[in-house]
Amino acid sequence: MGLDLSADPIALTAALVDIPSVSRDERRIADEIEAALRAQAPHFEVIRNGDAVLARTNLGRPSRVMLAGHIDTVPIADNLPSRIVDGEMYGCGTSDMKAGDAVFLHLAATITEPTHDITLVMYDCEEIESSANGLGRIERELRDWLTADVAILGEPSGGYIEAGCQGTIRVVISAKGTRAHSARSWLGDNAIHKLAPVLDRLASYQARSVDIDGCVYREGLSAVRIDGGIAGNVIPDAASVTVNFRFAPDRDVDQAVAHVHEVFDGLDVTLELTDAAAGALPGLTQPAAAALVAAAGGQVRAKYGWTDVARFAALGIPAVNYGPGDPNLAHRVDERVQVAAITAAADMLRTYLTT
C-alpha cells in the first residue's frame, strides 16, 4: 500500500519514517513520494530528478512559496520502525526531518486553491558531503524550478520560524619553531608555546550580537582543534590551532576572513582558510515572508547553525527554517518528535497558504 497524503500528517510521518532512506539509498522513498503526488495531487506538475521529487502548481498566483525538505536520514541506529510513546513519535528521521516532509506533502495534496503558487522540493543526500546534496544538483540541472518569493525548509526548529542562518569559516593558524631535545630546550624554539597568544586572544574575544529583522544573531570565534608535538622528549617545530568563526549574515565570507585576520594581527603565525560557507539574511521584510511570520504569531528567532537556507539566499530567495522537530533531538538514537507539534505545524502552514 502506498503513501496516503490525505491521511493525518502524524500517520503520514510514521509511514515516511518506516521507509528506510539513509543518504544515497533514497530511491524507494522517492518512488513512493512520486507515485503518491502523481495520483493524489493532480493540480501539481510533478517531475523526477535522480532521487529527488519536484512538484509545482501553475495557478497564476501573484506569489510563489517553496516547501523544501530532504528525504534522507543519518544511518539507522536500531531505531526503526517508528513508535509512539507518551505523545512522542520515536524513530530515525522523525525530527530531522520526515515530520516536516509529511506536513509539506499533506498540505500539497489537500490544498487545492492556495493563495500562493506552491513549489514542493523533496531532495536527497542532505546529510552527507555538500557536493552530493540533491539541492545543488537541482540548482545545476533545473534552475527554473528554484524560483520563489519565499522558501520554507522543513528542518527541525521547535515550531519557531528560524530565519536566515549564520555563516561559517574554518581557519588553521600555524606556528613554526626549531626542533631540539627537551633536555636542552633553550636550543630550540617551541612552536606550541607560540600558540599561547592565539589562545589568549580567543579566550578574551568579545563576540558580536547583531539584530537583523528582529532576529538576534550571536557570533562565535572558537578553537576546535589543536595539533602539535613529535615525541615526549622533543621540542616541537610546528603546531597549529583550528579556529571556527560563526558569523552573522550581515557579513560575507571575505569580511569574515578579514575579521579573523584582524583578531590575530601582529602574531608570529600564519593563517590558512580551509572551509567557508556564507550565511543567509532573514529577509523577513519581504511580503510573502512577513505574512508567514504573521501566521506563526510572531514566533521567530535567528538560526545559529548553517542550513540549506543559505543555498536559497544565494539565489536571491528569502528563506526560513520551519519544522515540527526539535533540533536538539536530531541524529540521536532516541530521536523523536512531539505528535502535537506535527499537527500545529500543519495547521499554521495551512492558514498561511490559504489566507
Swiss-Prot record:
Cofactor note text: Binds 2 Zn(2+) or Co(2+) ions per subunit.
Catalytic residues in the record: D72, E126 (proton acceptor)
Binding positions for Zn(2+) 1 per the UniProt entry: H70, D96, E155
SUPFAM superfamilies associated with the record: Bacterial exopeptidase dimerisation domain (SSF55031), Zn-dependent exopeptidases (SSF53187)
Phenotypic effect of disruption: Cells lacking this gene show multiple auxotrophy (Met, Thr, Lys and DAP).
Enzyme class: hydrolase
Essential cofactor(s): Zn(2+); Co(2+)
EC number of this enzyme: 3.5.1.18
Alphabetical UniProt keywords: Amino-acid biosynthesis, Cobalt, Diaminopimelate biosynthesis, Hydrolase, Lysine biosynthesis, Metal-binding, Zinc
InterPro entries for this protein: ArgE/DapE_CS (IPR001261), Bact_exopeptidase_dim_dom (IPR036264), Peptidase_M20 (IPR002933), Peptidase_M20_dimer (IPR011650), Peptidase_M20A (IPR050072), Succinyl-DAP_deSuclase_DapE (IPR010174)
Role noted for this protein: Catalyzes the hydrolysis of N-succinyl-L,L-diaminopimelic acid (SDAP), forming succinate and LL-2,6-diaminoheptanedioate (DAP), an intermediate involved in the bacterial biosynthesis of lysine and meso-diaminopimelic acid, an essential component of bacterial cell walls.
UniProt record similarity statement: Belongs to the peptidase M20A family. DapE subfamily.
Subunit structure: Homodimer.
Protein name in UniProt: Succinyl-diaminopimelate desuccinylase
Origin species: Mycolicibacterium smegmatis (strain ATCC 700084 / mc(2)155)
The encoding gene: dapE
